[in-house]
């Protein structure tokens, strides 16, 4: 499945001697109880190729993408044995995600002015931020496709967290394969988390 592919691809891309996985525990980023307990998730991660599994504290795992990412980077940096950080995304290029992360980190005046103008329209902060980024980067079509995807949003926050924490970790983007976020189907053995949960609920395994 996707996580197994991610683990193997990450180790390959990094030329890693070992792999550390930081995963949420019994509660997910949506604030819901995980469909399997944290011990089962850790066991599956080890079976998939991880050498060490560390729980992302609930304080981070149920929080925003920004806090989720900051927690993960903080843990990996604190180990002093990790030099690369692999994350999943649906974007085609790491550079595209980095462009956005740089704006969010630097907060240039042009961007903040547009953001302030968008917020005055009464729209939500996430929507105002998305609009401001697209207008500031001057490529609405290109960045709309990136910013409209939850996996990309988390990837951007990881990249921003690396900058915020002045981390030495080298970012490695693993492109999502076959099935996109929230797709309820299986393609060549790949399924989204939503699809897997649905299969388990319907006991079609």
Question: Model regions: which residues?
Answer:
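A glycine-rich helix N-cap at a beta->alpha junction
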Residues: 43-57
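Active-site cores that bind ATP or allylic diphosphates and position pyrophosphate for catalysis
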Residues: 55-205
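Receiver (REC) domain switch/active-site residues of two-component response regulators
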Residues: 17, 51, 83
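N-terminal catalytic cores of NTP/NDP-binding nucleotidyl/phosphoryl-transfer enzymes
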Residues: 1-38
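Glycine-rich loop at the start of a catalytic domain that most often binds anionic cofactors/ligands
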Residues: 32-43, 67-70
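Non-catalytic positions within long, well-ordered alpha-helices that form the structural scaffold/packing
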Residues: 11-12, 46, 73, 77-78
């Amino acid at each position: 499945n996707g996580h197994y592919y991610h683990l193997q691809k990450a180790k390959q891309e990094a030329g890693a001697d070992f792999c550390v996985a930081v995963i949420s525990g019994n509660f997910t980023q949506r604030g819901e109880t995980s469909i399997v307990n944290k011990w089962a998730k850790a066991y599956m991660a080890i079976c998939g190729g991880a050498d060490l599994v560390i729980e992302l504290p609930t304080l981070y795992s149920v929080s925003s993408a920004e806090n989720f990412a900051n927690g993960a980077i903080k843990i990996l940096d604190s180990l002093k044995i990790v030099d690369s950080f692999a994350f999943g995304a649906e974007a085609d290029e790491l550079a595209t995600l980095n462009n956005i992360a740089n704006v969010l980190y630097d907060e240039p005046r042009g961007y903040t002015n547009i953001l302030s103008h968008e917020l005055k329209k009464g729209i939500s902060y996430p929507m105002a931020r998305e609009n401001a980024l697209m207008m500031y980067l001057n490529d609405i079509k290109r960045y709309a496709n990136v910013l409209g995807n939850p996996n990309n949003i988390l990837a951007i926050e990881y990249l921003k967290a690396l900058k915020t924490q002045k981390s030495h970790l080298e970012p490695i983007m693993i492109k999502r394969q076959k099935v996109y976020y929230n797709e309820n189907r299986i393609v060549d053995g790949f399924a989204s988390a939503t699809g897997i949960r649905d299969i388990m609920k319907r006991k079609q395994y």
